């Protein structure tokens, strides 16, 4: 039978020993909505729980084993019991401690799980089967010596309930380390274990965390090394990293696949459950000092850390905050909602992060077209394919902008890019043969086949802002459907960034919607806000609710300039929160189409207490950065 699981504390090997075919559940990459889940679960239950619900109800599994790792998993179990009563649904209550009493309790609960599954599947568990499942072998004369190892559930419950139950110290697992990384892990874990013992109740002997069960680490001297941590991460994150020439040094997310348990012939189940419970602790465990020790060891050795979280999950936010303050390695906070729509946002963030740490080694189209790039050509082109506008810049060898165009993005990003390309070449008075290199950026960058390379808008805006004003350190870019804050160093290199591309609030589309409600043009909205005489607050951050709030203000006969000013302040407040996440450091620059809205500009300046630098055409900053990168590539 096919049984799913979502947590590393599930006794996968024991269930496989009893005949279950265990499948680690990840977010279905084809999933586009949570229609079934949201019909019987609260909207704010974490996205992974909803995705798991959809996966189980798809009919490909005979059951699932959940754990009490969080309230969302408990609510998921309730919903599954109601909607799929014929499936095997078991919630394993995992202790938050790892002391001897906790190990005994966990062993008893695993026994209850095995008993329940045995009845469901008409199967019988034995420690001999578990020993074999873990890789243990018996010599021929021992072939039948374990026939008495059928699990006595009543005896196990009785023993586990006694305070005197102990796991013999002489039977603790031992294994030689195969490399220096594992040895270093052992030292780090031992340090963490000692801290755990010092903090524990002295009347209870707390066993050390099993130092042989280390997360697998692999550091490559020839490739950028990036680690993955946090909540459950799907395979797409790894695929993107590996496609960009990155070595994944470690993966310690919830459902990482690193399971290495050493079989013990005596008391096989007791040793096994002890080992499962004393893995590298997750963030829900009482003592996470071994986890901190692991980070202390590996973070100085990697180029960056991708810290994954799931929408509406707050389990790992505290650890991320601590690592963000103390980590010697750059960290990317990556939140996904476990749907296929997350891929574009995930790709942009990961590529921008890799570019910022100098770790991106993409297989660009340029590598296939290298011979077609003319060494005698003297111009380069930068193309910024955004949601609202497509912008193009032609630059010469002297780093001078020869021509630029801004056109409306149509239904096809590729077609709009081709039109912008033709128009900018016409304005520059040159032919395609005179273009040495074309680099595309923006959300539509992957849909421009004639570009030699594509680079994220994060890197391009950083480079473009530095071109227009080298003193700029913090950039605010508000586009048609996203907004981002970028911090750059003195060389124009991105050091940190934060994005909002999951919600229309605080973007150009939001302002368009409000202008339509006020029956004025978008160009009139900003100047109208400057004429405000009354302070109005738009409380809702959601674009839909904000529009309803604006309609209510109109019904109350409030003046259009006052409403416009309130909307501009709401947009500025959302932008300011992004800027604070990357660090407020002057000089400040604003780019994107919204930089032409004087109402929003004034509201942002009031919040930061400083003037914003805005270039003559703020919409071409990204395309200018792309052209600069193209110039570097063609040299």
Model-derived regions, located:
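Glycine-rich phosphate-binding loop plus the immediately following alpha-helix
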Residues: 410-413, 490-534
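Glycine-rich phosphate-binding loops at beta-strand->alpha-helix junctions
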Residues: 443, 580, 584-607, 618-622
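Conserved phosphate-binding/catalytic loops in two-lobed NTP-binding clefts
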Residues: 329-336, 457-458, 605-624
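Conserved phosphate-binding catalytic cores of ATP/NTP-utilizing and phosphoryl-transfer enzymes
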Residues: 368-375, 443-491, 576, 625-632
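Redox- and metal-dependent alpha/beta enzyme cores, enriched for Fe-S-associated oxidoreductases
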Residues: 6-27, 229-294
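N-terminal glycine/serine-rich phosphate-binding loop of ATP-dependent small-molecule kinases
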Residues: 375-457, 596, 605-606, 610-612
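Adenine-nucleotide phosphate-binding core of ATP-dependent small-molecule kinases
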Residues: 546-579, 619
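Glycine-rich phosphate-binding/hydrolytic loop that grips phosphoryl groups
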Residues: 511, 615-635
């Amino acid at each position: 039978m096919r049984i799913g699981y979502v947590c590393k504390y599930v006794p996968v090997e024991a269930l496989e020993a009893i005949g279950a075919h265990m499948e680690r559940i990840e977010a279905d990459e084809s999933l586009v909505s949570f229609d079934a889940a949201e019909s019987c679960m609260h909207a704010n239950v974490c996205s992974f729980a909803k995705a798991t619900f959809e996966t189980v109800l798809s009919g490909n599994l005979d059951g699932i084993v959940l754990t009490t790792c969080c309230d969302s998993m408990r609510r998921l179990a309730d919903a599954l019991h109601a909607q799929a009563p014929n499936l095997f649904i078991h919630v394993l209550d995992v202790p938050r401690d790892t002391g001897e009493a906790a190990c005994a309790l966990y062993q008893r609960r695993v026994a209850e799980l095995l008993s329940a599954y045995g009845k469901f599947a008409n199967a019988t568990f034995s420690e001999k089967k578990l020993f074999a499942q873990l890789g243990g072998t018996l010599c021929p004369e021992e072939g039948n010596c374990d026939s008495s190892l059928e699990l006595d559930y009543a005896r196990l419950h009785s023993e586990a309930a006694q305070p005197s139950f102990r796991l013999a110290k002489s039977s603790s697992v031992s294994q030689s380390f195969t490399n220096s990384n594992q040895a270093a892990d052992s030292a780090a874990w031992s340090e963490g274990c000692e801290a755990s013992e010092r903090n524990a109740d002295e009347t209870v002997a707390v066993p050390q965390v099993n130092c042989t069960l280390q997360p697998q680490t692999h550091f490559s001297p020839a490739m950028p090394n990036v680690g993955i941590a946090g909540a459950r991460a799907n395979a797409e994150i790894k695929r993107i990293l590996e496609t960009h020439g990155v070595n994944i040094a470690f993966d310690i997310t919830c459902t990482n696949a690193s399971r290495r348990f050493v079989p013990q012939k005596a008391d096989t189940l007791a040793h096994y459950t002890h080992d499962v419970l004393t893995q590298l602790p997750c963030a829900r465990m009482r003592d996470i000092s071994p986890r901190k020790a692991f980070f202390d060891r590996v973070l100085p050795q990697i180029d960056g850390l991708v810290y994954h979280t799931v929408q509406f999950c707050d389990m790992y936010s505290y650890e991320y905050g601590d690592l963000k303050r103390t980590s010697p390695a750059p960290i990317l906070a990556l939140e996904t909602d476990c749907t296929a729509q997350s891929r574009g946002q995930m790709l942009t963030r990961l590529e921008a992060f890799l570019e910022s740490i100098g770790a991106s080694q993409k297989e660009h189209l340029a590598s296939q077209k290298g011979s077609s790039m003319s060494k005698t050509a003297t111009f380069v082109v930068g193309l910024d394919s955004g949601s609202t506008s497509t912008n193009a810049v032609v630059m010469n060898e002297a780093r001078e902008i020869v021509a630029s165009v801004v056109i409306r993005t149509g239904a096809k990003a590729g077609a709009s890019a081709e039109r912008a390309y033709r128009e900018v070449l016409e304005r520059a008075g040159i032919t395609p043969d005179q273009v040495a290199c074309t680099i595309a950026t923006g959300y539509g960058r992957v849909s421009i086949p004639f570009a030699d390379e594509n680079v994220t808008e994060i890197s391009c805006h950083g480079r473009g802002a530095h071109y227009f004003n080298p003193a700029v350190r913090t950039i605010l870019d508000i586009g048609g459907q996203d907004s981002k804050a970028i911090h750059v160093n003195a060389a124009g290199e991105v050091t940190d960034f934060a994005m909002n591309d999951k919600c229309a609030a605080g973007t150009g589309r939001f302002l368009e919607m409000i202008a339509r409600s006020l029956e004025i043009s978008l160009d009139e909205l900003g100047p109208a806000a400057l004429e405000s005489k009354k302070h109005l607050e738009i409380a809702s951050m959601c674009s839909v609710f904000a529009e309803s709030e604006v309609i209510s203000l109109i019904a109350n006969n409030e003046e259009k300039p006052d409403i416009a000013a309130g909307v501009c302040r709401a947009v500025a407040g959302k932008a300011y929160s992004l800027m604070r996440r990357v660090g407020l450091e002057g000089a400040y620059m604003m780019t994107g189409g919204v930089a032409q809205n004087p109402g929003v500009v004034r509201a942002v300046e009031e919040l930061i207490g400083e003037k914003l630098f805005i270039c003559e055409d703020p919409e071409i900053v990204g395309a200018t950065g792309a052209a600069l990168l193209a110039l570097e590539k063609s040299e």
